[in-house]
Amino acid sequence: MVRITKVHTGIGDRGTTVHLNGETVSKGDDRLEVVGCIDELNCLIGIVRMELKRMPETTLDGGPRTTVLAAQREFDKTLSHLQQEMFDLGAECSTTPDSIPDGMQVLSAESCERLVNEMDEWLEEVEPLSSFILPSGNPIV
């Protein structure tokens, strides 16, 4: 578990930041942009998890909403795991392959393959799409 003791550097903003490997780079650095995109994705996954937990678990007559319960049960664990992997990937992108610290979690080919397999399994349960769907109607989409 990472322990963060402060959230500022104390030296002000000079348009640069320091990667995990100690390298000072411009805040316009491509790797930093990638880390920011990964962080935003991680935040969105967190919002999906929150919205899943906020969905009513019972119908108006008090019966269970089995689809919601199943989604909460199955997806929260998967999304939690994915969030941790995205956090690890962001850290990995904050350094170079030759300067990855000992013991640092890196995203493995097996992790990527597992995610692809999970997505394929989820797609087996839905009807094929005939067009793109615009996200709307519910905060979770």
Model-based region annotation:
Residues 1-141:
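Phosphate/pyrophosphate-binding loop motifs in nucleotide- or prenyl diphosphate-using proteins
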